[in-house]
Each structure stands twice: as structure tokens, then as C-alpha cells.
Design a protein with these regions (language model features):
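Nudix hydrolase/Nudix homology domain
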Residues: 27-29, 98-139
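Short, well-ordered beta-strand micro-motif
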Residues: 11, 82-86, 104-107
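Short, solvent-exposed loop/turn segments at secondary-structure junctions
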Residues: 28-29, 67-71
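A short coil-to-beta-strand element that immediately follows conserved catalytic motifs
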Residues: 57-65
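A generic structural micro-feature
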Residues: 1-3, 73-79, 95-100
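Active-site-adjacent beta-strand/loop module that shapes the phosphate/pyrophosphate-binding cleft
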Residues: 69-92, 119, 125-126
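Conserved Nudix-box catalytic region and its N-terminal flanking loop in Nudix hydrolases
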Residues: 13-52
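Conserved N-terminal beta-strand and adjoining loop/helix that marks the start
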Residues: 1-18
Length: 139
């Protein structure tokens, strides 16, 4: 079974709204993020994905959720890691128009309705905290 890591950004604006992206491949909504590429750290991948999908420069903070799932059909074991992310500016721009159809700032309640794969409210994730530390290369 192949291992896959996927990172997501929980970004909240000054009004308390969270940013969601509407994906073209499955016609669904998600937090900005995506697959960690070979050689990337989790933070590098998330910074890249947020820029590609939203045009925002991400300041990656603490981990707020780790989920996992297995797919026998795809023969993959996936770790989904959600980070709290801050940005200096809230003006968004889709750079990956073939992957992202729309960006939308929504209230937490509205976002919860669109994010059907989470069993908890984003409110819960906004208050979670687990420190992330990259230990770099160890010989």
C-alpha cells in the first residue's frame, strides 16, 4: 500500500470567516491544500499549495488535526494534516484555474455544511494545537 501525505490550511480572516476552495476534479469544497511532493517538508508543501490555489502567502502555524484513511481500491494509505495558517493579506487569486473553480470566505457554520468529510466543526479545530517541529536532516 502506497503512503500519501496531504496538507490543508485552516485560514481565518479578520471577520472570523474561513477560506474554502471549490475543486474542479470532484466538484466539492475543501480547505486549501494538497499532496506533499517528494522531497518537500509539510510546511513547504502547504506554502506551495496555498500560493497555487489562492495566491496567498501562508505563514504556517500549529497542527490542528491529523486524520488518516485507507483506500483498497486505490491501494493508498493517506495522512491528512491540517495546519492553522495566517496571512498578511486577504486578497485571493486562483493560480491553478484547472484545479480550482472558486474561492470563498465563509462563516464557520457555512464552511461546516460544505466540508462533509469532517465529523467535527471547524470551531473545534480552530482551538486545537499541536506544535509542529521540522527536525531537518538527521544522519
Amino acid at each position: 500500500m502506497k503512503d500519501l501525505k496531504v496538507v490543508y490550511a485552516l485560514i481565518q480572516n479578520e471577520n472570523g470567516e474561513v477560506l474554502l476552495v471549490h475543486n474542479t476534479d470532484d466538484d466539492g469544497w475543501s480547505l486549501p491544500g494538497g499532496k506533499v511532493e517528494y522531497g518537500e517538508t509539510l510546511v513547504e508543501a502547504l506554502e506551495r499549495e496555498v500560493m497555487e490555489e489562492t495566491g496567498l502567502t501562508a505563514k504556517v502555524g500549529d497542527i490542528v488535526s491529523i486524520n488518516e484513511g485507507k483506500s483498497t481500491r486505490m491501494n493508498v494509505h493517506t495522512l491528512f494534516i491540517m495546519f492553522k495558517v495566517t496571512v498578511d493579506e486577504y486578497k485571493t487569486e486562483i493560480h491553478m484555474k484547472d484545479e480550482i473553480a472558486e474561492l470563498r470566505w465563509l462563516t464557520v457554520e457555512e464552511a461546516d455544511e460544505k466540508l462533509v468529510y469532517y465529523h467535527h466543526s471547524l470551531k473545534e479545530f480552530l482551538s486545537n494545537k499541536a506544535t509542529y517541529y521540522n527536525e531537518g536532516y538527521v544522519d
